Amino acid sequence: MQEILVLGAGKIGALITGLLADSGDYRVQLADKEEGAADDVVKAHGHGNLDAFMFDASDAASLTAHIRANNPVAVISGLPYYCNVAVAKVVREENLHYFDLTEDVAVTEEVRKLAEGAKTVFVPQCGLAPGFISIAANELIQHFDELKSVKLRVGALPQHPNNVLKYSLTWSTDGVINEYGNLCQSIVDGTEVDVLPLEGLEQIEIDGKLYEAFNTSGGLGSLGNTYGERVTTMNYKTIRYPGHCEQIRLLMNGLKLNHDRSTLKRILENAVPQTLQDVVIIYAAVTGFQDGELREENYVNKVYPELVSDRLWSAIQITTAAGICSVMDLVLSNPSNYSGFIAQEEFGLIDILENRFGEYYAHGGTNLTSAEAVARGATGHQR
């Protein structure tokens, strides 16, 4: 049984911990800096393969001391993006495998530099977007002789929106603000460029329902680096219900809260409720030439909340945790096949979907799951 250190007992870390422990192949060390946070998750899971610890993982000395005392083979960071470089530095020094969920471009570049020459693996951006969307798009790309455009679209939305933003906080508020406020990598006319967030507003119709999509930061991952010389257009946009972008523009641009993110975070967390009743929409479209003909292929999927260990977990929790667990599982099953920096697109879509963790993407659940769970009181407390 391999020892895994999971940093952060929040929304995603709690499910990562449960999935890995339930597999029977991993013993999980869950750490959080807040008193009782890791203990509460471990008690809620009630699993013998879990241990709780309290320390500040952003402090190099504390993290190093824990690693040397408890000997994990890999570290999963479920911490806010701004903590990950410090964690990755310690992991590099201790010769462990590293996985994170960051969407931040600058953090990923720092991790890439740290991974140079490493015999262990460094795999950032292991969540949904970036993460699974890159894997799905890469599979489509392989079907074409010549590429023209690659469009990545992902959204985590409340199933039943009833506020002016038509949105609920389903994951990290810091992460949402970061995506909405930072420059966005794109390829336009064959050239890598940075475009403004909250721009490029478009309508998109999926299963007969109308959504909007607009530029946000980080979701392109490393696909631009991998295929930049082969594609004319490549971009990533976040999917929301119509009208959301206009409201966020008012907050971030009109009221200048992009320059006062702590205030924006406080406003959002005081006004926008959390929910476990969400839906994740994944949409990738690739256009190019096959056998001399211009064609398009799509990957479209909706993932709903699911019951894990008799408790309801949101779709964004399911997709994010399944993404990083499946990638780590593939690496640790064949560690000799990997070393250094590993981009998400180096993993095969079918390998992810057939993995015991990645299979959550394959069946996706239904929109009835959360309704039934609420009706019989199975939503529960996750920690």
Which residues make up each language-model segment?
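Hydrophobic/small residue at the entry helix of a nucleotide-binding pocket
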Residues: 12
